[in-house]
Amino acid sequence: QVASSDATNMELEITRDGDEYVLNGRKWWTTNAIGERCKIMLVMGRSNPDAPRHKQHSTVLVPRDTPGITLIRPLRVFDSFHSPGGEAEFVFENVRVPVSNMIKGEGCGFEIAQGRLGPGRFQYAMMFVGMAQRCLELMCERAEQRVAFGEKLSKKTSVQHEIARSRCD
């Protein structure tokens, strides 16, 4: 068992049993599931292993207090200002939810995940580019204001090189 950023690698099983789905397996990374406001989790798992790769998974709504959900450990997010933000590893053992908790239909889990993750990647990229631009602005302001050995830092070649390298990166 391994964690993976490939959404098609999820091993948690979602099996239909009459009017319910039964969930069994491990979720290595569950975002915000231990936050105090989390009452319902969106859980993606493999519901049809014989289907084409991108149609094997489904997503179901699972109330956080459903019997059979075990918190294994909280996880930290590297470089996050809000870490730990509620991310955790869970085990699901015979967790039962009504068939009506299926989102969009069986086999639509990957589509749902990509619909959220795709735009999210752009949002994070824009956020970090903005942060980098602000850091560059602050560096330039500081180099212009700070005087060392009778000269502004902005006049020193080594500082100019560092600013230029930062702009290129």
Give the ranges of each region predicted by the language model.
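Glycine-rich beta->alpha junctions and the first turn(s) of the following alpha-helix
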Residues: 71-169
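A gly/ser-rich beta-alpha-beta helix-loop segment of oxidoreductase catalytic cores
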Residues: 1-15
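A short core secondary-structure module
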Residues: 26-72
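Buried hydrophobic positions in well-ordered alpha/beta secondary-structure cores of metabolic enzymes
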Residues: 14, 23-25, 60, 92, ...
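A generic structural signal for beta-strand entry/edge sites
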Residues: 18-22, 40, 87-89
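Glycine-rich phosphate/pyrophosphate-binding beta-alpha loops
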Residues: 3, 28-35, 81, 119-124
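Short glycine/proline-enriched turns and hinge-like loops at secondary-structure junctions
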Residues: 5-8, 33-38, 53-56, 82-84, ...
